[in-house]
C-alpha cells in the first residue's frame, strides 16, 4: 500500500512514518506539511491511505478531507490529531478512523488493518468489473502498415499521437507509423485503460510515469517510455477523473 502523512509538525510526521515502517507492508510512505504539497502528492501518486491532522497551517484538515473525498477514487482517510472535538465531523466524511495523539503502534495498526480489509474487498470487486469490460474488447489492436498487419497487444501500447497526418503508436518495444486517423484506433481500444487527453493524443493510463503542471492550467503527461503528451484544456476534467483527482 501507499500512504501519505499530512501534518504541519515534522515530529508527528516522523513518528507516524516510523510506526508505519514498524508495522510494514507499505510500498511507499510520503509526507506533506500543507495543502500545496498534499495536492502535488495526490497528482503524482494514487494513495491507499492518508493520515490527516485536523489543524494545518493553511487549512482546516476537515475541509481538506472533504475535498479529498470528492476524488473519483479517494484514499482511506484516518484523522490523526491531538483534538477530539472533530470526531463527529470526521466520521460524517466517511473517515476510516480517528486517532488521538500521542500515537501508539497497536492503535495505528488497528486502523491500518481496517483499510487493508476494505481494500481487499474492493480489489476483488474491481478485478471482476475490469475482466467483464475487457471481455468486450479485443486484446490486440490490428495496425496495417504497407503490406503487413501488426497485431499489437493492447497492454503493450503506451500511447498514440498524430501529427501532420501521421499517426504514431508507441509500444513498450517499438513505435509504428501509419496514416490511419486517431479515431479509427480509439474505437478499438479498451476504455478501462485508454483515454483521449487531446485531439491528437490517446494514452494508456497504466503507462503514466509522471504528471506535471503545464501552461494555461493544463498538464503534461510523461509516459513510461519518456514520451511527453499534453492534456488539452477541454479534456482536463475527464483526465483528472481517470487518475482519481475528481
From Swiss-Prot:
Residues 2-116 form the Response regulatory domain. Signal peptide: none annotated. InterPro entries: CheY-like_superfamily (IPR011006), LytR-like (IPR046947), LytTR_DNA-bd_dom (IPR007492), Sig_transdc_resp-reg_receiver (IPR001789). GO terms for molecular function: DNA binding; phosphorelay response regulator activity. Phosphorylated and dephosphorylated by LytS. Disulfide bonds: none annotated. It is found in: Cytoplasm. GO terms for cellular component: cytoplasm. Keywords: Cytoplasm, DNA-binding, Phosphoprotein, Transcription, Transcription regulation, Two-component regulatory system. Coiled coil: none annotated. The keyword Chaperone does not apply. Transmembrane segments: none annotated. The modification 4-aspartylphosphate is found at residue 53. Residues 141-245 form the HTH LytTR-type domain. SUPFAM superfamilies: CheY-like (SSF52172). Gene3D superfamilies: 3.40.50.2300, LytTr DNA-binding domain. It comes from the Bacteria. The keyword Cytoplasm applies. It holds the Pfam family Response_reg. Homodimer; when phosphorylated. Member of the two-component regulatory system LytR/LytS that regulates genes involved in autolysis, programmed cell death, biofilm formation and cell wall metabolism. Also participates in sensing and responding to host defense cationic antimicrobial peptides (HDPs). Upon phosphorylation by LytS, functions as a transcription regulator by direct binding to promoter regions of target genes including lrgA and lrgB, to positively regulate their expression. This is Transcriptional regulatory protein LytR.
